[in-house]
């Protein structure tokens, strides 16, 4: 740690990290695969964890939401950070089509309040940093028939 950081501040940082490690220990049993440490912030929501694989030292920051229900899973490499308030949603909440999923390479991150709509396959490479509020969608509405509503024409999933 930086020498300019005082003892009290170091204790606070270590205490908060320890809480995240403890949350990770409790939640890792609900995930398909976890290597190394898993750090989980407060109010993180993980659903369908048996479709989620994490490499070494993955961090889910506060208020992030990760849904694993998809055909190819959510696969996060080593040292991946999912920022505060990020949503990863491969499928509809309400029984729509099952999505494909997400793969993130080592040392990559999604900045705060990002949205990953991975109903089609989304692949993020190694050493990639997505900035705050970045949104990726692997789906598009079909809108070729002008006499029909866009909702009634369906979607196509392409990543």
Labelled PLM ranges:
Residues 46:
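Glycine-/small-residue-rich active-site loops that bind phosphorylated ligands and cofactors
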Residues 49-52, 60-159:
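Flexible, glycine/small-residue-enriched loop-and-beta-strand segment within the central core
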